[in-house]
């Protein structure tokens, strides 16, 4: 195979890897934790990954404690857990 063909193949494989969804075993463990608003009484929009629905959902975060399945934006949640 020519060097141009090898470069094309390498590029296609790289693209394929970027487009392939993350399997549940490759997701960070905290993506499987339930959403946790924490004990504080704040009212902050946040997002968490719902592993059964396999999507990110909105919830109200109290502002303290909680757990790592807590994202400021839906895009951050999707990049981390639903990609």
Swiss-Prot record:
Stretches of the chain forming a coiled coil according to its record: none
Free-text tissue specificity from the UniProt record: Expressed by the venom gland.
Origin: domain of life: Eukaryota
Keyword Transcription regulation: no
Keywords associated with the record: Disulfide bond, Protease inhibitor, Secreted, Serine protease inhibitor, Signal, Toxin
Site (Reactive bond for trypsin) location in chain: 41-42
Family: Belongs to the venom Kunitz-type family.
Protein name: Kunitz serine protease inhibitor Pr-mulgin 2
Organism: Pseudechis rossignolii (Papuan pigmy mulga snake)
């Amino acid at each position: 195979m020519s060097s141009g063909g090898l470069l094309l193949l390498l590029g296609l494989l790289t693209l394929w890897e970027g487009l392939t969804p993350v399997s549940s075993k490759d997701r960070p463990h905290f993506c499987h934790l339930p959403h946790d608003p924490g004990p504080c009484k704040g009212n902050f929009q946040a997002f968490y990954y719902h592993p059964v629905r396999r999507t990110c959902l909105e919830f109200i975060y109290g502002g303290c404690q909680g757990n790592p399945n807590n994202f400021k934006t839906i895009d951050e949640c999707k990049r981390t857990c639903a990609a």
